[in-house]
Amino acid sequence: MSHPQQRFFVAGVKQFLPSYFSGRSVIEIGSLNLNGSVREFFQDCNYLGLDVGEGPDVDLVCHGENYGGAANSTDVVISCEAMEHNPQWKKTWLNTLRLVKEDGLVVMTCATPGRRQHGTVEFNPSDSPLTIGKSQNYYRNLAACDFTDLLQHDAWFSVWGFFEDRSSHDLYFFGVGKEASEEARTQALQLHAALKDHYHKVNVLGHY
């Protein structure tokens, strides 16, 4: 489910890494358009939106952990505000890393500790209608350590980072692959520094 802080993060990634948002192959995991879609950030791309049921901006009904595309075949894999609703988020994350090219980009946003439960039978089921429709009544706020305990991200990415926005209780990730160009690595390092500074201002100085 789209919201301003999450869209700000994706826009920031695009600002610093624009080449990944035009003329590329893209897979979005959890692509249902509820109140806005990250699809609009991409231009002239071969775009495939996956979700667990039919709906706006869903191109293929498929669980993210089950999508069997070729390994190292996709320029960008993106998932926004979906992992917290996915009981198989670990397998989905591993499949994300399997799918992305060695010089590709991964972008992920999800809820982190402090966010109120949503998209369940008990709390705001309309926030995740496809999982509710599949009787998948699951929710978990995720922290960076949940992902870093799963695997060593340095094995996949030359530049990467998790960032937390405590104003919205969001967790954000971006990473560019080990074979990314020198230009992309430089841009990614600049992005990492800018995000670190921004979320220090938000989380520590209260600038939001």
Question: Whereabouts are the PLM-identified features?
Answer:
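Conserved SAM-binding loop
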Residues: 15, 21-116
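Intrinsic disorder/low-structure terminal segments
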Residues: 8, 20, 40-41, 146, ...
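Class I SAM-dependent methyltransferase Rossmann-like catalytic core
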Residues: 1-20
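S-adenosyl-L-methionine-dependent methyltransferase catalytic module, highlighting the catalytic core
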Residues: 87-101, 105-208
